[in-house]
């Protein structure tokens, strides 16, 4: 997201008139050149406002379609106090995590590919649930996202995180790091 901010500033300063899609594309190229291993989700998600579903087609040319969602389940007075952002202070390097996930995909590991397909469908389910402003189902789906992330990357849930989530598990519909 920092790279997108810098490229946006360069565009403004130099009068290049790049739109958000172009800034996202250039950010993706920059991150690949820097070997950070980033994908398009963070770049395009960070430079397009609001709650949304981003989708792309297969292939190298990534031009995400943005489908905005209502923010009711986050801003409605009945639901707003139910959301908490908690900083654990635990840091991880995305580069090595992503490299391992991509390696397993290129090796055609069946479980990995099945999980990625399941996560894609899960994203559509979440989109539909937020469209309906179904807070209870959204919480259940967030919990499912957490389980999927742990299957995708075993390091998602270190002991320090497990200790925290054990304290709140009975009080939450879902949570995610």
Range-by-range predicted roles:
Residues 1, 22-26:
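Glycine- and acidic-rich phosphate- and metal-coordinating loops
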Residues 1-16:
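DPxDG-like acidic metal-binding loop motif
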Residues 3-4, 20, 38, 47:
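Short alpha-helical patches at coil-to-helix transitions and adjacent helical residues
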Residues 13-17, 25-36, 43-176:
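C-terminal nucleotide
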């Amino acid at each position: 997201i920092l790279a997108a901010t810098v490229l946006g500033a360069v565009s403004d300063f130099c009068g290049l008139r790049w739109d958000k899609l172009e800034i996202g594309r250039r950010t993706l190229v920059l991150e690949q050149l820097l070997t950070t291993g980033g994908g398009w989700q963070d770049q395009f998600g960070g430079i397009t406002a609001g709650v949304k579903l981003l989708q792309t087609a297969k292939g190298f040319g990534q031009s995400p379609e943005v489908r905005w969602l209502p923010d009711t389940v986050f801003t409605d007075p009945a639901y707003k106090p139910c959301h908490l952002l908690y900083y654990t202070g635990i840091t991880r390097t995305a580069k090595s995590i992503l490299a391992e996930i991509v390696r397993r995909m290129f090796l055609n590991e069946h479980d990995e590919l099945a999980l990625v397909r399941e996560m894609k469908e899960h994203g559509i389910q979440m989109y539909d649930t937020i469209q309906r402003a179904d807070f209870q189902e959204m919480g259940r789906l967030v919990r499912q996202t957490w389980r999927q992330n742990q299957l995708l990357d075993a390091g998602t849930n270190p002991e320090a995180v497990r200790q925290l989530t054990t304290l709140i598990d009975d009080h939450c519909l879902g949570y995610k790091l």
